[in-house]
Amino acid sequence: MGTIHLFRKSQRSLVGKLTHEFRLVAADRRSWKILLFGAINLICIGFLLMWCSSTNSIALTAYTYLTIFDLFSLITCLISYWVMVKKPSPVYSFGFERFEVLAVFASTVLAQLGALFILKESAERFLEQPEIHTGRLLVGTFVALFFNLFTMLSVRNKPFAYVSEAASTSWLQEHVADLSRSICGIIPGLSSIFLPRMNPFVLIDIAGALALCITYMLIEINNYYAVDTASAIAIALMTFGTMYPMSVYSGKVLLQTTPPHVFGQLDKLLREVSTLDGVLEVRNEHFWTLGFGTLAGSVHVRIRRDANEQMVLAHVTNRLYTLVSTLTVQIFKDDWIRPTLSSVPIANNMLNLSDHHVITMPSLKAADNLNPVTSTPAKPSSPPPEFSFNTPGKNVNPVILLNTQTRPYGLGLNHGSTPYSSVLNQGFGIPGMGATQGFRTGFTNVPSRYGTNTRGQSRP
């Protein structure tokens, strides 16, 4: 039978959780303005959809989708306020900033799907063009234009403002920029208005309204109904071209990639860290975008054995914190004691052992209290370190040196040749470990698995 919980906390449903989070956001006065714009947006969308049905205009429908996108942007702004008031939890230790990235990505992808739907409907209308009624066409155009511009310019939407600046320019922005340069070449006084990078949302709102005005005039003058379908295709293409760079940028953030524009700055900071006093090596560095304008990273630093860990950690954090706001640094001390010798089979290509000298390791003091990987005192209950830098481990085969090599002194070496029989009978090893065949040779293969010694026993 399972455990009986007398005072078990009741689990909230999904609707209850959403209601609780919505109340948390609504408690902030700054969100009241967004909620008001959202209510007006829903009313405006309802009227526009009715006018789209009465006019039978697919171009007005495509333009209405931009108003629906404004509703998504307002929801994204609410999520941004929710992220500000929420604190990191054990499940989301980095905070909830990725939720607003996900909201931007979802909004732009939905806008592109709406543009694809308009393209599909327009292709069907080219085969059989219906009659377009212009009664509410111009009214719907100006209502949608006014509300879109009023929403974009009145509400400070931090996520979309950042994405529109950081993402690559759309083809519509590039063409408008070329046209602006030509106009400013004739009238230099307009350079302060046209030359800066235009807001892509304002640009597509104005371009879509201009296309609908041209549609209205051509239908009123010549009853040319096909221009409505052409305008719908143009608005859909502009929508897709405007949203695509933003979805790509937010998608890269979700994939935890490093922004290309910070490569040079990160490389410079890592070079400065590698020159700090006590630092021997910087490796396993990984940096990624946690949210819009927030960079996170982790780095492993190998230091000298006599270096102060806290001092090095403070210097490394101080250097990288100027660019990386969320940083994890792991400090490892240098490992200079080699692991214990282990028995290995004699290679077939070693014909005469008398031509070699076997180096025996000096006696290890307090071998039981040393970690064989990092050679630092470790408690019996402490787990092995996660990483080691350029450390072969316990399973590295011994090395046999030739007679022609220089013999080091003061290490307890046996000078002179060792008979073949004594090598096989006596064996070499660490005191207290038993007599084993402990030759250091570079001819046998080094086991590729870390954590298992050559005796077939797994390391704890």
From Swiss-Prot:
Keyword Transport in record: yes
Stored Pfam families: Cation_efflux
Protein location: Golgi apparatus, trans-Golgi network membrane
Membrane-protein topology: Multi-pass membrane protein
Membrane side Extracellular: residue ranges: 55-64, 120-134, 222-228
UniProt region (Disordered), positions on chain: 372-392
TM region positions: 34-54, 65-85, 99-119, 135-155, 201-221, 229-249
Subunit structure comment from the entry: Heterodimer with SLC30A5; form a functional zinc ion transmembrane transporter.
Matches recorded under NCBIfam families: CDF (TIGR01297)
Family: Belongs to the cation diffusion facilitator (CDF) transporter (TC 2.A.4) family. SLC30A subfamily.
Name of protein: Zinc transporter 6
UniProt source species: Gallus gallus
